[in-house]
Amino acid sequence: MKKAIYPGSFDPVTLGHLDIIRRSASLVDHLIVGVLNNSTKTPLFSVEERVNMLREVTKDLSNVEVLSFSGLLVDFAAEHNVSVIIRGLRAVTDFEYELAMSQTNRVAAPGIDTIFLTTSLKYAYLSSSIVKEMAMYGGDIHKFVPEEIIDRVYEKYGIKQ
C-alpha cells in the first residue's frame, strides 16, 4: 500500500489546497493530510478547527485521513509508516524553499521522498494569507475557499455574510 502525507498549516484550507489533496488522493492508496500545530505561530483557526474543516471538505475522499501533528514532519511520517511527502508548488519561489526542505528531510530520514505537484493554474496565485486579508476587509472569498467554510472564515473577523 502506497501512503503519502500532504502537510501544511491550512489556516484556512483553500481551493488550491483541496485541488492538491484531490489529485494526491488519486495517486496513492492512502493520503494523510497532516495539519501542523506550530506553537510558535498564532493561527486564525485552532488546530482542531482546521482538522475539522479539512475532514468536512474531504469527506467524499475515502482514502484521505486528516490528522494533526507537531514537531518534525519526518518523525510524523515515520510514526505512520509513510515514505512519501507531497508538496504543492505555486511558483518558482515555492520551489527554492521546498527543494531545501525536501533535501533536509532526505538527510534526516533517507527513506522519505518528496513529490512536488504544481498547483492548477487557476489557483497558482492563491494562499491562505490572501484569503485572510480579503476576509478581514470583508472581501469576497467565495472563489478561494470551499463553500463549507466561508462563514467560519468571516466569523473569525466578526463579519456576517
Swiss-Prot record:
CDD domains: PPAT (cd02163). It catalyses: (R)-4'-phosphopantetheine + ATP + H(+) = 3'-dephospho-CoA + diphosphate. ATP binds at S9, F10, H17, G88, L89, R90, E98, Y123, A124, Y125, L126, S127, S128, S129. It comes from the Bacteria. The record marks H17 as: Transition state stabilizer. Substrate binds at S9, K41, L73, R87. Its cofactor is Mg(2+). Transmembrane segments: none annotated. One of its GO terms (biological process) is coenzyme A biosynthetic process. Keywords: ATP-binding, Coenzyme A biosynthesis, Cytoplasm, Magnesium, Nucleotide-binding, Nucleotidyltransferase, Transferase. It holds the Pfam family CTP_transf_like. Its EC number is 2.7.7.3. It is found in: Cytoplasm. Its main location: cytoplasm. The keyword Magnesium applies. InterPro entries: Cyt_trans-like, PPAT, Rossmann-like_a/b/a_fold. Homohexamer. Belongs to the bacterial CoaD family. HAMAP family: PPAT_bact. Reversibly transfers an adenylyl group from ATP to 4'-phosphopantetheine, yielding dephospho-CoA (dPCoA) and pyrophosphate. This is Phosphopantetheine adenylyltransferase. The lineage of its organism: Bacteria, Bacillati, Bacillota, Clostridia, Lachnospirales.
